[in-house]
Amino acid sequence: MNTENGYITPADALSRLFQNGFFSRLDLFFARFISEVTGGAAPEVVLAAALVSKYTAAGHMCLNLASMAGEQLGLPDDGQTFLTCPSLGRWRDLIAQSPAVGMPGAVRPLILDGKDRLYLYRYWDYETKLARALIARVRTNEAFDTALLRDGLNRLFPPADDGECDWQRIAA
């Protein structure tokens, strides 16, 4: 974690990334929360907590550790790197050892699945419940009324006068 100004601690690096707008206040506080509830988590775990918070706020379901491993964190505009993410194997091992992290099925603030994806528990739970509901629907053999389906499609996508293929109708 060297910068042009010399060595900085991981906590200082997170603070600088917050000050420069890379992390939000929520990301920083969540990372600090994980550090506090674990009695001082490894800096790599605290970094992962801040990143999973950031990625979730940006609309992602999880943080893919493999895609972030070795990445340099900073803002492109300032040209400074404040932190480099650890290698995948080391990062995964440190995260898995943290008491704040559980495997799928556990109730912990963070969930690490078998594909190196780190989730906030709530989002892992949402994804799991949604997947189960979709699988259950696919497995039901309920008959559907094809005439009703055809009428609905005709109402939403009337036949084109030019004889062209209506790709929206086909997609629906």
Residue ranges and their predicted role:
Residues 1-172:
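Helicase P-loop NTPase motor core of nucleic-acid translocases
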